[in-house]
Amino acid sequence: MSKGPAVGIDLGTTYSCVGVFQHGKVEIIANDQGNRTTPSYVAFTDTERLIGDAAKNQVAMNPTNTVFDAKRLIGRRFDDAVVQSDMKHWPFMVVNDAGRPKVQVEYKGETKSFYPEEVSSMVLAKMKEIAEAYLGKTVTNAVVTVPAYFNDSQRQATKDAGTIAGLNVLRIINEPTAAAIAYGLDKKVGAERNVLIFDLGGGTFDVSILTIEDGIFEVKSTAGDTHLGGEDFDNRMVNHFIAEFKRKHKKDISENKRAVRRLRTACERAKRTLSSSTQASIEIDSLYEGIDFYTSITRARFEELNADLFRGTLDPVEKALRDAKLDKSQIHDIVLVGGSTRIPKIQKLLQDFFNGKELNKSINPDEAVAYGAAVQAAILSGDKSENVQDLLLLDVTPLSLGIETAGGVMTVLIKRNTTIPTKQTQTFTTYSDNQPGVLIQVYEGERAMTKDNNLLGKFELTGIPPAPRGVPQIEVTFDIDANGILNVSAVDKSTGKENKITITNDKGRLSKEDIERMVQEAEKYKAEDEKQRDKVSSKNSLESYAFNMKATVEDEKLQGKINDEDKQKILDKCNEIINWLDKNQTAEKEEFEHQQKELEKVCNPIITKLYQSAGGMPGGMPGGFPGGGAPPSGGASSGPTIEEVD
């Protein structure tokens, strides 16, 4: 077959979708069943492996060997809390293989286990086939989407799944970003518009705010809940009917996997019906112990069962607005993505929240992400049509990134919600005299102290030529590429010696829950953090004052300008303070300030006398006038040996 165009694939938790940009527009491709979305399901039987509709259709007969939700496992460790809690709800087995989760199934009469990447690769391979059948050409290049909060390890694992499926993954892009691209092509606008994307799918919920101006997209903020979606609404209905069955027939079907599966399938169908009708009926023959289950549910009851979940979708909306520093009145467009946004109650809650504003439903919510991915695939593979030409895409980093400086302080180089790709450089210095190396520790998180943040990696820069503290200049650079991969490097300016690290760690960067939790905790702890920051700052200012003062009076330029008695007085007091500091690293802010006042009492009169006699200092004092000191950031000897410079 000849080589086909690049495709866009929305690899969803519950459903996937594939699109292609050709003849100047996006076409969403239907599968062999005529469906434009395909279940992200893989089933193993005695005779074959089924993927998509075929797998989902036989799930009731073969629940333990039908795998879905691989996206919830991908790029995570087995002991990840998310994996542990999800396992309780899955009919298939998840086993621990050297810290990584694998799904275990019976296939052709033997026990097999697969990594999540392998399961996802089967779904991706299916999407590739669907595209090839439609195009009549081989498809290799693809853009694959992931939730905005997927961390590095999850993105990498998704990319690996593509490789396993025989795809060349041009880029991993965020789902909301993809939806924004779909939206951007539909609505070309000149003036800047703020767009809120509300993506409630089968398994995940993402809210993103973007600005679109002259074909340029910028993600301003993202928020959400990795564990909210259509399946949760199904679960509420399933539990409701299990309880009803108990009441009517005095029997508990909850332990019977097949009965629960059949009930779930009926509930999912009823839910869809309730988006267009106010009532749905459920008829299951011989559900349990030969009992037929015929019942019905109203839209109002469905809404009541899910009231807290539906209302809860507004929390991330408020959070995204806060993070983007926007008021809800400043949002120009609200875009619905994901099948669950068809639920009338959710549309109403959202519309009411935005004071009756019209919602944008012009894009089929199930297809918007694949649509945008297809456009991005065309751009990356060099499509020259004008619809695509002037479109540029900017993503953001979900957490602040920085390094630890003296005293365990988190010094941020890249703030959260910074547009990527991005590069930031800052110069640091040594903390003690003749220090031969520095340890660069890279952290992500929003807290003031690194101990409260997440360590991503560390490396040493050695071979710094002997020099007094504060003299060497070490330039640290953080560089994030378009795929969100972080490179950190450090260079000693005097020798040109360099060392660097690429952060792609398996142990998983933070999950979305962690990020959410950290941001919430950060707000809660902000006050504590400020207090700690002030404390370290007053300690550092005292420390640099003492060291600078000592260096000043020992400077040979002052020979003969200062009498020995005064000089000794200052040195004694400085040494006393330095000794006190060594013993009192964790003192309170007030104590540091008190010690500094005591030291100034001794030094100020002598220094003033010097100034008057000399008419200004010859050649300027080393390290600036004492008390100017280094910026507040010197610190605990226990901290790493690196210090921030202005």
Swiss-Prot record:
Subcellular location(s) of the protein: Cytoplasm; Melanosome; Nucleus, Nucleolus; Cell membrane
Covalent link (Glycyl lysine isopeptide (Lys-Gly) (interchain with G-Cter in SUMO1)) residue numbers: K512
UniProt keyword list: Acetylation, ATP-binding, Autophagy, Cell membrane, Chaperone, Cytoplasm, Hydrolase, Isopeptide bond, Lysosome, Membrane, Methylation, mRNA processing, mRNA splicing, Nucleotide-binding, Nucleus, Phosphoprotein, Spliceosome, Stress response, Ubl conjugation
Residues with PTM N6-succinyllysine: K319, K512
This protein's record includes keyword Glycoprotein: no
N6-acetyllysine modified-residue sites: K108, K246, K319, K328, K512, K524, K589, K597, K601
Membrane topology: Peripheral membrane protein
Post-translational modification note: Acetylated. ISGylated.
Database matches in PROSITE patterns: HSP70_1, HSP70_2, HSP70_3
Modification sites for N-acetylserine: S2
GO biological process: clathrin coat disassembly; mRNA processing; negative regulation of DNA-templated transcription; protein targeting to lysosome involved in chaperone-mediated autophagy; RNA splicing
PTM annotation (Omega-N-methylarginine): residues: R469
Positions of the UniProt region annotated as Substrate-binding domain (SBD): 394-509
Binding site for ATP: 12-15, 71, 202-204, 268-275, 339-342
Oligomeric and partner information: Component of the chaperone-assisted selective autophagy (CASA) complex consisting of BAG3, HSPA8/HSC70, HSPB8 and STUB1/CHIP. Identified in a IGF2BP1-dependent mRNP granule complex containing untranslated mRNAs. Interacts with PACRG. Interacts with HSPH1/HSP105. Interacts with IRAK1BP1 and BAG1. Interacts with DNAJC7. Interacts with DNAJB12 (via J domain). Interacts with DNAJB14 (via J domain). Interacts (via C-terminus) with the E3 ligase STUB1 forming a 210 kDa complex of one STUB1 and two HSPA8 molecules.
Free-text note on domains in this protein's UniProt record: The N-terminal nucleotide binding domain (NBD) (also known as the ATPase domain) is responsible for binding and hydrolyzing ATP. The C-terminal substrate-binding domain (SBD) (also known as peptide-binding domain) binds to the client/substrate proteins. The two domains are allosterically coupled so that, when ATP is bound to the NBD, the SBD binds relatively weakly to clients. When ADP is bound in the NBD, a conformational change enhances the affinity of the SBD for client proteins.
Name of protein: Heat shock cognate 71 kDa protein
